[in-house]
């Protein structure tokens, strides 16, 4: 049976979490790594919401889905699939909660609550708390945009991360919390090939 981690529900419950060792056991809005996106979105929606200009290398296609009716906990659910995969198998999945500039502290509070639950659920995984760093985006010329980041590594190289992004007005992006699940293969590609 899948362990359903709907992160924001866990924050408000006193559930005892089972230790997990497979990223496919976790869901964001009922969606998991390894699922076909066609179970949740039409092909037309996937194509319409694809951001084909996001990566330099086109091996994977990112899809940004904002404010769908079935989203209960997140404002957006984003995913990546191999560009030529007609089944649209999800290899990276994110839940996003948006915040106004004046509400960034709410993002940090929510992040701490989620991390507390994840630390229990993933006590068997290697955990790395990066803390707060300057965002590397070319739009961040004044070095005012930051991100706060913690991630959990599975033994097979898959990863879950939690990040709060605090963007400056000059950057032009909206502050948000991001919970991301990704396979090792996708993570390696993202690190070494996506922007070449």
Feature-to-residue mapping (PLM):
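Compositionally biased P/S/T/G-rich terminal and signal peptide-adjacent segments
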Residues: 66-89
């Amino acid at each position: 049976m899948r362990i359903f981690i709907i992160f924001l529900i866990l924050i408000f419950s006193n559930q005892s979490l089972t230790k997990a060792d497979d990223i496919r056991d976790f869901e964001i809005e009922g969606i998991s790594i390894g699922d076909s996106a066609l179970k949740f979105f039409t092909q037309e929606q996937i194509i319409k919401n694809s951001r084909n200009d996001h990566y330099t290398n086109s091996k994977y296609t990112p899809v940004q889905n904002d404010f769908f009716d079935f989203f209960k906990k997140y404002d957006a659910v984003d995913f990546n699939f191999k560009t030529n995969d007609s089944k649209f198998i999800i290899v990276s999945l994110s839940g996003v909660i948006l915040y106004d500039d004046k509400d960034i502290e709410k993002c940090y509070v929510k992040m701490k609550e989620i991390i507390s639950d994840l630390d229990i659920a993933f006590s068997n995984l290697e955990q790395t708390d990066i803390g707060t760093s300057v965002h590397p985006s070319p739009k961040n010329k004044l070095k005012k945009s930051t991100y706060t980041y913690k991630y959990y590594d599975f033994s097979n190289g898959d990863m879950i991360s939690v990040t709060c992004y605090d963007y400056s007005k000059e950057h032009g992006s909206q502050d948000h919390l991001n919970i991301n699940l990704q396979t090792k293969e996708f993570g390696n590609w993202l690190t070494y090939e996506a922007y070449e």
